[in-house]
Amino acid sequence: MKIDSIQVKDWRNFQEASYQLKPGLNFITGQNGCGKTNLLEAISYLSFARSFRKSPDRDLIRNSCSKAYVKGIFTCESEKYSKQVEATLTTSGKQIKVDGKKAKTLSSFVGTVLTMVFEPKLVFLFKDEPSERRKLMDETLSSIDSKYLYSLQRYRKVLRERNQALVTMADDEIVGVLTNELIRVSFPLVQSRLSLIKELGVKGDKYFQQLFGSSSKLRFTYRTNTIVDDDMETYTRKMIAQYDRKKSYERIHRMTMIGPHRDDLVAYLDDKPLGSYGSQGQNRLASLSVTLSLAEMIKEKRGEDPILVLDDVMSDLDTEKQKKLLDTIQGFQQVLLSGSSLDEDAEKVNVIEIKSDVVDEEKGGQ
């Protein structure tokens, strides 16, 4: 998949601008604060209808404006078709359209545009809260399979209902019904995550060796308080027993203490937890390796390259590692890379410079 053009209006610090993109490497540049990250954020927004910087929608609307607008034209190479995706944001909500038709639900929209994003804060992926790593797994798996997204949404709904039942001290029969349903919808989530982490172990270490060139081995585990079993009946029976053991504890704390909503993806470098013992450089390259690995998985499962979005990835890499990264990403159909300078053959790169006349300098940007 590739993006052919992007149009933004009243998005962050952009007044109005449009850019043409090409297959291969696209380098987005400009003065500091011109809005390089803002443009990548707009493109990524057309994948999940939310900012990869966790900003609320109201912060994406330019100062003194009532709405923001983004439109992208995408080409799906494997199936030979183009799609137009639009997002209109107001202070009261948002609307997503695909080929002029309003997307009724998030699940009907996610997976239309495939992107994989690396942004500077991912350096702290394995130092951050487990929720950030669960989010990364969930977004990747939702892009691969709409059934996963449906199961995830169903799980979250039942989880809210069960937590509410615990808060209101509902009787055991009501909690038991919700427990059985929670176990049922959790099974495909756990199985999909386990499969993803198994593949990540192979691909992640491969990319880490390519970029870092060391003998250190990168591996991943799934830290869970659920039951790891690929048989649904066995899983259900053991999970019921698990919940029974936690029954009094959950009643006291009035919240669900078991399930994939509390699980974690943990990285190890030479058998030491990366988040605790790894240097910032090792954490950066490990997080970048995860990004490339997940992009490769999407390509294999969907038969289509995701658009690889790399925001300010070069700034803390030495010249040798920059070259290794540029060599590595050549395998992807389209890469969007932001930065201030790039030591690469100009003929191989589509350079997009953000000019000062299309942005509000006083609001700034990245």
Regions found by a protein language model. Name each.
Residues 44:
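Helix-to-loop junction immediately C-terminal to a conserved catalytic motif
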Residues 72, 334-341:
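Structural recognition of the conserved hydrophobic beta-strand(s) that form the central parallel beta-sheet
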Residues 36:
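Conserved lysine of the Walker
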Residues 311-313:
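Walker B catalytic acidic pair
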Residues 1-31, 173-307, 316, 320, ...:
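Conserved NTPase motor "head" modules and their coupling/switch loops across ABC/AAA+ ATPases, GTPases
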